[in-house]
């Protein structure tokens, strides 16, 4: 407003205390002074002002309107008639809050948007200052009408569940499983119910009992809470659960925990075992202490007795008696030693140096420069059979008339076996005749080749050499054959006899399986064989074995005869071994 050409701010307090307040103030409408526009504000229910649609103004307690000079009940509000009561009501109108601020908290329902009817704007609605102009009769404009439509809220239900101190079992139909029920605490209320309870407690301090809405007509129905009072426990039967899959890291951790737990259990058991042993030893020690104390008491009791007095004997007689007892003891020990000793003294003293009997049928002449012939050989005598003084059944010394070979016979037997092994070895058999071990056809062809070529690798074999010239010629031929053997190289043999080399490797494998000894001959026969069992069997006698093997004839054989080599053996041990079919297939003809 412009008073006396001076612009003042729109401060209501300054206007009221201004002494130069214009007398035309009673003609102004309070709506424009209070709010600056023609819009009206809502009034609270606690205020003494009421909003009226007829005069669009405020009425006081006595019914008069504020700011309307047309009212007959009260004069218009001015500085002269603005009383103290009006001042208080005026201040209250500015201090009171809107009644719709806590609408949602009071009624528990969301606040709905107000229906506002907008009226056409005019040039006076946005004016901040009022000028003194002659009143113009403007057409009556409609004020904004605010209609509050509260949302109907459902009655709040409060369900209070009390815990029951009993456990019930409900027996269902025979086809269904039994379920065990247990008592649980009341479930937590829903968030909406908790909010409603908090809102009610904000405005009501005393407990409020729920009043259920009943129908106007019809029988009374009691509303029962649908909240479950019992929660079923899992059934007692096993439930098939899917196997849980763990990662490698989880499996490693589980294994580590298992191993650690097992280690702790073992340590605990070991500690308990040690404690038990310690307890037993302590008990045994206590028992021994008790017995020792008892023995000491008995010893002390006997020590108090008087000692027995012995009459001393002469010194010479006692010394002689001791010597006799010592000599008798020595003789007794010597006799026991002679009886129990495993050494046969008599047999060792009665050893005869004569050559033992050897069967002439199996004797052969070896290839040596100096060989004793059959005619010039000394007579061989048999050892007279006599029973020794000490005959031990467990000893193998005198069982079955065992013979002992002298140096000459030992050399002869070794040469015979070595010759047989060399003839039947893979290296000395010609490749065109080699068909496998113990192959009869191969042996027949080999014998025929030996007849055609009597001078073999080993030289000619004769019964006796009487003249020195013949002996010299024989030695020269042997040297010649040895030199020819030295000219052969191993490469040619390997190139020509690849199959034989493979068989040799297989035989080496078999020898490693058998654990071959250096001084033992091992013979494997894989074709038909004939067994001649022993006629006399003894449990304490050493078993003997005689092998009959095909051999090379010495001086030629007849058409219907075949030469065999007999090998007498003494069994020193037996054992079993396992060979594969592939290894045996190389040895089969």
Swiss-Prot record:
Gene3D superfamilies: 1.20.5.170
Basic and acidic residues compositional bias, start-end: 1-16
GO molecular function, one term: RNA polymerase II cis-regulatory region sequence-specific DNA binding
Region (Basic motif): 252-275
Coiled-coil region list: 271-305
Cross-referenced SMART domains: BRLZ
Any one GO biological process: positive regulation of transcription by RNA polymerase II
SUPFAM superfamilies, per the entry: Leucine zipper domain
Gene Ontology CC, one term: endoplasmic reticulum
Keywords tagged on the record: Coiled coil, DNA-binding, Membrane, Nucleus, Transcription, Transcription regulation, Transmembrane, Transmembrane helix
Induction note: Expression is repressed by micro-RNA mir-124 (at protein level).
Biased composition (Low complexity): 36-54, 67-78
Protein name, UniProt field: Transcription factor atf-6 homolog
Gene from which this protein is expressed: atf-6
């Amino acid at each position: 407003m412009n008073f006396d050409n001076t612009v003042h701010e729109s401060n209501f307090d300054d206007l009221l205390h201004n002494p130069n307040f214009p007398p035309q103030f009673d003609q102004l409408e309070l709506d424009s002074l209070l709010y600056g526009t023609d819009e009206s504000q809502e009034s609270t229910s606690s205020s003494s002002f009421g909003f009226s649609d007829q005069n669009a103004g405020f009425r006081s307690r006595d019914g008069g309107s504020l700011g309307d000079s047309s009212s007959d009940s009260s004069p218009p509000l001015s500085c002269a008639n603005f009383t103290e009561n009006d001042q208080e009501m005026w201040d209250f109108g500015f201090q009171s809050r809107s009644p719709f601020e806590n609408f949602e908290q009071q009624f528990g329902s969301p606040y709905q948007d107000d229906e506002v009817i907008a009226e056409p704007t005019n040039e006076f609605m946005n004016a901040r200052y009022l000028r003194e102009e002659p009143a113009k009769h403007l057409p009556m404009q409609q004020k904004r009408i605010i209609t509050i439509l509260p949302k109907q809220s459902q009655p709040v239900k409060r369900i209070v569940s009390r815990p029951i101190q009993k456990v019930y079992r409900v027996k269902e139909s025979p086809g269904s499983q039994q379920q065990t029920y247990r008592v649980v605490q009341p479930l937590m209320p829903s968030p909406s119910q908790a909010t409603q309870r908090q809102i009610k407690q904000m405005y009501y301090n005393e407990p409020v009992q729920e009043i259920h809405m009943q129908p106007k007509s019809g029988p009374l129905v009691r509303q029962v809470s649908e909240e479950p009072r019992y929660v079923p426990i899992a059934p007692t039967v096993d439930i098939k659960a899917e196997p849980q899959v763990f990662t490698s890291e989880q499996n490693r951790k589980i294994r580590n925990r298992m191993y650690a737990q097992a280690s702790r259990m073992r340590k605990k058991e070991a500690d308990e075992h040690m404690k038990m042993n310690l307890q037993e030893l302590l008990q045994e020690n206590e028992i021994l202490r008790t017995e020792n104390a008892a023995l000491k008491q008995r010893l002390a009791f006997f020590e108090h007795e008087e000692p027995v007095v012995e009459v001393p004997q002469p010194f010479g007689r006692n010394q002689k008696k001791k010597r006799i007892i010592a000599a008798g003891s020595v003789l007794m020990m010597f006799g026991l030693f002679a009886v129990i000793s495993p050494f046969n003294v008599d047999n060792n003293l009665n050893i005869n140096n004569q050559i033992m009997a050897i069967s002439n049928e199996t004797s052969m002449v070896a290839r040596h420069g100096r060989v004793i012939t059959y005619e010039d050989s000394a007579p061989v005598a048999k050892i007279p059979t006599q029973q020794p003084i000490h005959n031990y059944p467990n000893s193998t010394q005198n069982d079955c008339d065992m013979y002992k070979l002298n140096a000459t016979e030992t050399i002869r037997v070794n040469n015979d076996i070595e010759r047989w092994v060399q003839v039947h070895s893979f290296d000395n058999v010609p490749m065109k005749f080699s068909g496998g071990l113990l192959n009869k056809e191969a042996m027949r062809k080999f014998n025929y080749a030996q007849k055609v070529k009597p001078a073999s690798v080993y030289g000619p074999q004769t019964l006796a050499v009487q003249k020195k010239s013949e002996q010299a010629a024989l030695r020269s031929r042997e040297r010649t054959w040895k030199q020819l053997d030295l000219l052969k190289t191993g490469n040619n043999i390997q190139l020509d006899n690849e199959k034989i080399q493979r068989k040799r490797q297989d035989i080496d494998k078999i020898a490693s399986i058998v654990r071959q000894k250096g001084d033992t001959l091992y013979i494997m026969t894989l074709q038909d064989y004939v067994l001649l069992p022993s006629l006399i069997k003894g449990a304490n006698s050493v078993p003997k074995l005689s092998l009959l093997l095909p051999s090379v004839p010495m001086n030629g054989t007849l058409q219907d005869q075949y030469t065999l080599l007999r090998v007498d053996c003494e069994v020193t041990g037996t054992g079993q071994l396992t060979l594969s079919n592939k290894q045996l297939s190389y040895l089969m003809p």
